[in-house]
Amino acid sequence: MSQAKNIIQMVVMLTVVLLLSGCDTLLKGDGVVDVKGQYFDLANRSVAVVVSMSDFTEFNHPNAKEMITNEMTRRIMSNVPGVTATSPKEILAWQKENAYWATRPPSALIKQLKVERLILVEIGEYRTHEPGDRHVLRGVISASVHVVEAEAADPDNFGASFTKNVMYPEPGESKIGRVGDSEELIEVRTQIRFCESAAGVFYDHQIVR
């Protein structure tokens, strides 16, 4: 029950952040930056977003996988023309039912999920405060984002791979609006910043800092 309550609270917090930020950008800052996409072959294709992280990270941040799966899928659906995506709820249920899915080759995963493109988000570092000091809040997410292509001669060789490292707040970033920020809010803002960057490789977009 407490985990369900935590998820609801995180969803509400995420919704508030999105509404306050104009939905597709998180922070009001010094200017608008145009960012070019790097991989455009999701258009008019079926897609699944699958997020993996260590057991340690998942234990300490039990809502993280769901939140990132939801937000990555939402952004791709909102910005890539003609794309269809397997629902995050279905993906998360599939992961629970197939506990050792991460040990299987990408070619087997994309075949089982019955999609044309599989986006694998492999999260490495994930934290909400400075190492060794829980009183200094700073979110960090580092991950590899891989694209598996169903029709490739060898789907086990990724069609594209990207490395994403995000931090919130960044050193020197304006502190306006951060007085009294909680660890939960720092986590949500870091998740949004990560998804903005990770999903953004699939379409042209703007970010506000």
Residue ranges and their predicted role:
Residues 1-12:
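Bacterial N-terminal signal peptides that target proteins for export
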Residues 17-20:
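Bacterial Sec-type N-terminal signal peptides, specifically the leucine/valine-rich hydrophobic h-region
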Residues 23-45, 109-112, 137-140, 146-209:
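C-terminal/domain-edge helix-coil "capping" segments
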Residues 46, 51, 55-124, 150-153, ...:
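N-terminal segment of the mature soluble domain
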Residues 63-64, 134-137:
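Short, glycine/charged-enriched secondary-structure capping and boundary segments
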Residues 128-133:
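Extracytoplasmic/secreted cell-surface and envelope-processing proteins
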